[in-house]
Amino acid sequence: MGASEKRKDYISWDEYFMGIAMLSGMRSKDPNTQVGACIVSPDNKILSMGYNGFPKGCSDDEFPWERENDKDSNLTKYPFVTHSELNAILNYRGGSLEGTKLYVSLFPCNECAKAIIQAGIHTVVYDSDKYRGTPSNRAARRSAFHTAGQDVRYISGSERQIKGV
């Protein structure tokens, strides 16, 4: 490669934004599942980011991180954790999210799918689909994304090792 030619091995926009989503997920204190999300404008500007965690003002040390509790299901993380997609939507302080793209490291649950559609986000790009086939996952695919006409696609965020990460 001569000095007058541009580099050819740079990462794509999809790789870049999925990398940002995955990096955001590393902020999660959840010991089992770390999910990150990044909302991007049609002209490839980052608008917002989020990761799964407890709401503002709720101490990470006082609320449970357990996935199961045989005595009381309210003593698990599930009633309290806000998912990365919803955090990214709520963290946005601009105008409309109409026509934007959401990069998320894990395929959205049905509740997040509804919020994504209502926010006007048009494209969802995800990396992992480890809950494929679960009731929430099937509902998100069928009733939410498919019916609403969302563009949903898979990319692997780990196709290329990001140096220094």
Functional labels for PLM-detected ranges:
Residues 1-165:
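Zinc-dependent deaminase catalytic domain
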